[in-house]
């Protein structure tokens, strides 16, 4: 009789251990604490953040956005820069110029501009900050424009031209950049 129950009990124990192991591999408590690879669905960027050699003429601390490359560079000392993948404005929405970061917000609220509502009447008129918000985990506001460098709840759009002119980053990348720059940082947008 004991043998009759021993095999099913052993099978259940094995399945439970296997499922727990798989869950442990997938679940990373840093994900919900803001530092793991799936930070609030920010996902990993299809274009990984990396330090590169940089021979541009911009001063350390400057952000340089290259829309044609779909990359953002934070100029560092010693001829280097941090390079991030970004999503850029789709055709008709790309722009260039020089601005300063005038505000920084964590988990920003979003109010779509009237022009966007006219194009997309299905959009909410206002969204509180959070994981469903298209501005993602952080936003840096550019001058007096409506444009921002911000996170995204759609990490798969990084490297694409899909926005209405803002620069999208994964939540991990925008959180990293946000911690490195301050209000007053110069942002150069190259639209070539």
Stretches found by the model and what they are:
Residues 2-192:
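N-terminal pre-domains immediately preceding structured catalytic cores
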């Amino acid at each position: 009789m004991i043998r009759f129950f021993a095999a099913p009990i052993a099978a259940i124990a094995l399945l439970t251990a296997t499922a727990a192991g798989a869950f442990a591999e997938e679940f990373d408590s840093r994900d919900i604490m803001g530092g793991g690879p799936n930070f609030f669905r920010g996902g990993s960027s299809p274009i990984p953040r990396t330090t590169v050699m940089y021979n541009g003429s911009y001063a350390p601390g400057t952000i340089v956005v290259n829309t044609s490359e779909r990359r953002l560079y934070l100029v560092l000392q010693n001829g280097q820069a941090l390079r991030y993948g970004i999503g850029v404005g789709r055709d008709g929405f790309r722009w260039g110029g020089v601005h300063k970061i005038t505000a920084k917000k964590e988990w920003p609220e979003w109010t779509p501009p009237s022009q966007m509502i006219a194009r997309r009447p299905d959009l909410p008129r206002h969204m509180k900050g959070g994981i469903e918000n298209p501005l993602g985990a952080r936003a840096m506001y550019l001058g007096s424009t409506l444009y921002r460098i911000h996170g995204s709840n759609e990490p798969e759009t990084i490297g694409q031209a899909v926005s209405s002119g803002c620069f999208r980053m994964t939540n991990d990348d925008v959180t990293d950049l946000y911690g490195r720059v301050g209000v007053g940082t110069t942002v150069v947008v190259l639209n070539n």
